[in-house]
């Protein structure tokens, strides 16, 4: 999530976040607006990128009720639509709700690289013209594989020391 925030800031975006597990959120970063509730976050943002673990609390968390809170105008008044990206875990975003919101035109776009039932994606959702999907290959970059290798070396080294 921090990497996405850095890229968003480099592109001139104002970054907002919600994390129920971080107690003193305001002290973590002066460049990020933290929200006390997920409802507040969705009510403030036209672009949402989901980065969380799958738990009983997060299953189906991003649903029609939350997305319908999203504005379609940026803070500086530009009509930009509503956009969601999910690269965390399948099942956190309610796929049926997203398809309904896309078909109605309420949701402008959905970027998704994880599906509730993998490896078989929801065919109607993945075929929608406003959906950009990949087959869960987000970690298949050279940089990601290098970081994984470095982490493995660190863990093995710590074990033997």
Task: Indicate where each model-derived feature is located.
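Rossmann-like dinucleotide/phosphate-binding beta-alpha-beta segment
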Residues: 1-72
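Rossmann-like dinucleotide-binding domain for NAD(H)/NADP(H)
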Residues: 68, 72-161
